[in-house]
Regions:
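N-terminal cofactor/phosphate-binding cores enriched in small/glycine residues
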Residues: 4-91
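Glycine-rich, acidic loop regions that bind phosphate or pyrophosphate groups
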Residues: 102-175, 270-379, 484, 506
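Active-site diphosphate/adenylate-binding microenvironment
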Residues: 9-13, 20, 27-31, 35-36, ...
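Glycine-rich, anion-gripping cofactor-binding loops and their flanking helix/strand elements
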Residues: 83, 245-331, 432-461, 474-478, ...
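Conformationally flexible catalytic loops at phosphate/diphosphate-handling active centers
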Residues: 3, 149-165, 172-177, 181-237
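Thiamine diphosphate
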Residues: 101, 108-130, 140-147, 425-584
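A short, small-residue-rich loop immediately preceding and capping a beta-strand
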Residues: 22-25, 46-48, 66-105, 302-310, ...
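Phosphate/pyrophosphate-binding active-site segments
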Residues: 1-4, 141-158, 162, 320-421, ...
């Protein structure tokens, strides 16, 4: 087995192995050659080669999102690591463990006009939980003159060994801290690694050792379950309680536990598509339920206590509702932090959701006099009735497409949804509860949805479908440039010839140069990209073509497939806005 000769490279590789980091995504370069050689020649690691660093980082994020363990990305020096930044910020806000291993030039070559060189240390400062800036090895006789000692050869050797030992200890400690923080906080870290030339020398086996001890004492997960008792007194005394679920993995909350806790006429549970929680007594499709409400209804329906679980919430309407008509108290349950999204955060229970629910259910009292849930149920049932009627009546459009597509997704599919309008349309429908749904809601960018979905498809046993818009798809089209996309992978692109969401936002259509600078109209289609990357391609421009295409789209195939659905950009916004009027 070829091992990089450079001790620092060996240290990084062995520390990753020690911490169980087995997935490594490598982008080509020379300065990172010691890491590339080491990772790719060690059978412990599953290595992927992705040229575009932005795609590589989102690809890694998709894997980490599914395995819920750190995944490493490796790049060369210079601007390469800046291309990781969108995925790093997404990982930071979505609490996904990502390890950035950036190769760097020696410190004496920084800011002197050397090529492919920038200030790499702490470059992600506000979006990682740890920065490890490693020290360059002193490993050559030619470097001995740099040591601050007398010109006695014996002293030079002693000083060399002592100095290198000191550097080794520092580097091992910094790497260990970074990887531990990545695991414990489920968040990104940056390890910057300076290498001097020569970069490609190898040896037959590792000549450094790493201690087996791994200190993973998690100070972030100290349960404060005893603090729930006091809160439950307030909970039981309140007649209007609302639970809102944000982004959650499918197995984080036990549906039956939550249903038992919420089995009370004074409690309602709002879920989002990305909550991955389903129960007949819960309230999915938040926007559908609350968007048509009038001010007087909002005042009457505001909760006394808001309890939240999970990560980011997609619905802008629930955020607007609870910020204007604020609850008296907002409590959040979960690790590691709580966002004051509604400006009323009072308590943060650092407890696993199921642990909280199991403990709190035993202490809750049935609030028989409240009609809070009954009022909401009447609203929900009314919306459902008119939603179905509207779907039956509307012509071919974005909304109609989502209605037809979501009905036909096979059971147990892993569904990735693009940002902007795609995820908002999906939120209007009560989807098949066997689906697992994910979306990059940490920063809500359109830039890496396809790369994330492809990465995720390699880390799940389920068939993966990505539903995305045209701008998001074309923006991240380099995601298709890889050798790993499984034949079962499917993409549905809703192409409305631009950023359709800007037609929905108030006022923008009347802005000068709206088509060019907001909607960014285009006449592109995905057929040539599919030819280039060996995807099966289908296109639908009306409902009959769509239904015919969907009949075979999910069948087994020798290649991944893409279905492009062309919708009328000038009708989509009118149909959606009329929808909220119709279901009132």
């Amino acid at each position: 087995m070829n091992i990089p000769k450079i001790p620092l490279a060996q240290t990084v590789i062995l520390q990753c192995k020690k911490h169980g980091i087995s997935h490594v995504i490598i982008s080509p370069g020379s300065r990172n050659a010691p890491l590339t050689i080491g990772f790719s020649n060690d059978p412990f690691f599953k290595c992927y080669s992705i040229v575009d660093e932005r795609c590589a980082a989102f690809f890694a994020l998709g894997i980490a999102q599914q395995i819920r363990k750190p995944v490493a990305v490796v790049c060369t020096s210079g601007s390469a690591l800046l291309n990781y930044f969108p995925a790093v910020s997404e990982a930071f806000y979505s609490k996904i463990p990502l390890v950035v291993l950036s190769a760097d030039r020696p410190e004496h070559l920084i800011d002197i006009g050397d090529g492919q060189t920038i200030n790499q240390q702490n470059v992600y400062s506000n979006h990682v939980v740890y920065n490890a800036n490693l020290k360059l090895d002193i490993r050559e006789e030619s470097k001995l003159h740099e040591l601050n000692i007398f010109n006695n050869p014996e002293n030079k050797v002693v000083c060399f060994l002592s100095k290198q030992k000191e550097i080794d200890a520092y580097n091992k400690n910094e790497i260990s801290i970074a990887l531990n923080e990545c695991i414990l906080q489920s968040a990104p870290v940056h390890i910057n690694i300076p290498f001097d030339e020569p970069l490609y020398e190898t040896i037959a086996s590792y000549n450094i050792t790493i201690s087996e001890d791994t200190d993973l004492t998690n100070s972030y997960c100290i349960s404060d379950i005893n603090n729930i008792d006091e809160a439950m007194v307030e909970w039981n005394n309140s007649g209007c309680k609302m639970i809102v679920l944000g982004v959650l993995h499918p197995d984080v909350i036990d549906n039956s536990l939550l249903a038992s806790f919420a089995n009370d006429p004074s409690v309602i549970v709002f879920t989002e598509t990305t909550s991955n929680v389903h129960h007949p007594n819960f309230f999915p499709c938040i926007d559908k339920i609350i968007a048509p409400l009038e001010s007087i209804e909002f005042k009457e329906l505001k909760p006394d206590i808001l309890l939240t679980f999970g990560g980011m919430v997609v619905s802008k309407k629930i955020k607007a509702f609870l910020r204007k008509y604020q609850p008296k108290k907002h409590w959040h349950c979960g690790f590691p932090n709580a966002y004051d999204t509604y400006f009323k955060l009072e308590k943060h229970f650092k407890v696993k959701p199921n642990e909280f629910l199991e403990y709190a259910t035993k202490r809750k009292l049935f609030h028989s006099k409240s009609d809070y849930r009954k009022v909401w149920l009447n609203i929900r049932n009314h919306r459902r009735k008119y939603h179905k009627q509207y779907m039956d009546e509307i012509p071919f459009s974005d909304l109609k497409v989502f209605d037809q597509v979501l009905k036909r997704i096979p059971d147990n599919t892993h569904l990735q949804v693009g940002n902007s309008s795609a995820v908002r349309y999906v939120q209007l429908f009560e989807i098949n509860p066997t689906l697992e749904v994910f979306c990059n809601r940490g920063t809500s960018g359109i830039d890496g949805s396809t790369s994330t979905a492809i990465g995720a498809s390699l880390a799940t046993s389920k068939n993966t479908l990505l539903i995305t818009g045209d701008l998001s798809f074309f923006y991240d089209s380099n995601a298709l440039w890889n050798n790993y996309t499984p034949n079962s992978f499917r993409i549905i692109v809703i192409n409305n010839n631009g950023g359709g969401i800007f037609r929905i936002l108030p006022g923008n259509k009347n802005t000068e140069n709206f088509d060019t600078f907001f909607e960014t109209k285009h006449e592109l289609n995905a057929s040539n990209l599919c030819d280039m990357y060996n995807f099966g391609y289908q296109c639908a421009t009306n409902q009959k073509q769509l239904i015919d295409a969907l009949d075979s789209f999910f069948n087994k195939s020798k290649n991944p497939k893409l279905l492009e659905i062309m919708t009328p950009s000038t009708l989509n916004d009118e149909i959606l806005l009329s929808y909220f009027d119709f279901i009132k």
